[in-house]
Amino acid sequence: MTAKIIDGKVLAERLRGQVADEVARLRADYRLQPGLAVVLVGEDPASQVYVRSKGEHSLAVGMHSVTHRLPADTRQDELLRLVAELNADPLIHGILVQLPLPKHLDEKAVIAAISPDKDVDGLHVVNAGRLASGLPALVPCTPLGCLIMLRETLGDLTGKRAVVVGRSLLVGKPVAQLLLQADCTVTIAHSRTVDLPAVCREADILVAAVGRPRMIRGDWIKPGATVIDVGINRVPFDDPEKAAQGKTKLVGDVHYKEALQVAGAVTPVPGGVGLMTVACLLQNTVTAAKRLAGIEG
């Protein structure tokens, strides 16, 4: 059996199309243009790529988009002042501070300063609490992308046994909450879980978000299970010649080639969950704009 490959590119393009249609409707019917502000502190190359992508995609769907690039030596009070200005700006409905921040800045304090109504990363404690309580919330983008991919692949998730490997605030815990709300039976596993392979083998849905390259092997996967690989790990090429040249590639937390022989469906890395994350950021910005404007539906 060869698993179905869940194509993140196709799903992300579809979601961006839906967002663009909704933005056009809001602009036509309500004269409301959803606005996203992205804040980048420092010059981390990966963060610059992510921020540029977010800006380009938000403009492409018709949103108002602003990027604030601050020097690496920006003080905490300066960053908090900018966040306060964005909180008060009626043209901005979503605020995203690109993480990680330089080490001298307090990430938790910065996230806490963002208005929960504009927290499109879904990291504010208010949104985390609302999600855990089953109340409407802005949900972290990667877990939201995982849920969309699962529903596209499986339809109704009711009664499925789901195992989430990883307990981070960014992915593991929120994706578990979303799966619970979808009426799955959920287990959160992690590096200290006893007999982790056996726990994984119980899963109809296996979400890997542990940050260890190719940790989850094919014989950890229940035949026919749906595997969502959130991991993004840079490793040397298997080819010794390329590895000797310092060349690297991206792999997930799942051993992809082995998973293909066992799973019913699996997301690739790259080309899977990562592509959904930016699309879900756009969706969250539209959701925030509608809630702030009191627009239903």
From Swiss-Prot:
This is Bifunctional protein FolD. Transmembrane segments: none annotated. The keyword GTP-binding does not apply. One of its GO terms (molecular function) is methenyltetrahydrofolate cyclohydrolase activity. One of its GO terms (cellular component) is cytosol. Homodimer. SUPFAM superfamilies: Aminoacid dehydrogenase-like, N-terminal domain, NAD(P)-binding Rossmann-fold domains. NCBIfam families: PRK14186.1, PRK14188.1. GO terms for biological process: L-histidine biosynthetic process; methionine biosynthetic process; purine nucleotide biosynthetic process; tetrahydrofolate interconversion. Keywords: Amino-acid biosynthesis, Histidine biosynthesis, Hydrolase, Methionine biosynthesis, Multifunctional enzyme, NADP, One-carbon metabolism, Oxidoreductase, Purine biosynthesis. Gene3D superfamilies: Leucine Dehydrogenase, chain A, domain 1 (3.40.50.10860), NAD(P)-binding Rossmann-like Domain (3.40.50.720). The keyword Amino-acid biosynthesis applies. It catalyses: (6R)-5,10-methylene-5,6,7,8-tetrahydrofolate + NADP(+) = (6R)-5,10-methenyltetrahydrofolate + NADPH; (6R)-5,10-methenyltetrahydrofolate + H2O = (6R)-10-formyltetrahydrofolate + H(+). Catalyzes the oxidation of 5,10-methylenetetrahydrofolate to 5,10-methenyltetrahydrofolate and then the hydrolysis of 5,10-methenyltetrahydrofolate to 10-formyltetrahydrofolate. InterPro entries: Aminoacid_DH-like_N_sf, NAD(P)-bd_dom_sf, THF_DH/CycHdrlase, THF_DH/CycHdrlase_cat_dom, THF_DH/CycHdrlase_CS, THF_DH/CycHdrlase_NAD-bd_dom. Pfam families: THF_DHG_CYH, THF_DHG_CYH_C. It comes from the Bacteria. Its EC number is 1.5.1.5, 3.5.4.9. Belongs to the tetrahydrofolate dehydrogenase/cyclohydrolase family.
